[in-house]
Amino acid sequence: MQESRQQKSGGGFELLFDEDRLKIYYNKIFPFSLMFKWISYNKLNAGQKALTSLDEGISSNYFHFREFSFTLANDVYCRYLCFKTAEQFKETLVDRVPYKIDIGAVYNIPPDRHNASDKRAFIPVQKEMVFDIDMNDYDDVRTCCTGANVCEKCWEFLKIAMIVLTDILVEDFDFENVLWVFSGRRGIHAWICDESAREMNNEMRSAVVSYCNLGVGNENSGRTTLSYPLHPRLQSIYKKLLPEFKRIIIDEHNLLSVEKHRKKFLDYCPDLTTKNKVDAIW
């Protein structure tokens, strides 16, 4: 049986998967009851009680009408999967052993019947709003790792991202249910689970994303010069992050001491006097 992880030459570990271990994980560890409770949002069928064990056969059309997709071994991709109960969900995962599970929208009919109806009649009715933050987005400012590699120092950036985005979503948009989860490889996902978010159309979602996006990207994307005075939300973020800047950027990553990182970092600075002063000091 293949080892589940191996140590890399540069430190840290690279995760390796094998079907035997995944089958044990799905059979013994995977939180099926919690997943069912979360994704059904207590929208159970008439006469049903809250789920307490998998063998109760508790059903929910809200769960049943939700699309799942699996990525199996050798990158075999399966769409339009759905399940009536948590027990059926478990049986399928243990049997098919997916390497990746994607949770899709809730449709107006069970997704496995999408070919039995007019495509215009198969429509999504609800879906959580999800923000995806990848670790490689921080390659300009982290000195420890690159790409999909992640260490404890890297996670400091993701922790800050969670704090900032949660503040915006809760304080500016009045969302209450923000679930942060590890994406499974190189980043984190924020699932906004409020019903108001699940009912948003694409235009509404784009407006929220646009509000949260400064447009200050990595070296391969466009950069935005901020105008002053700063927007009140940016002022609040600045005050909150200033102490973390010294701890993470200066002390932990020692970013300004390495010329190539310092140059890349100073490219973000709009004030020439400040850039020259920092460059001279370091």
Residue ranges and their predicted role:
Residues 2-183, 195-202, 207-209, 214-282:
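Signature for HUH/AEP ssDNA processing cores
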Residues 188-195:
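A short beta-strand motif that forms the metal-chelation/ATP-contact edge
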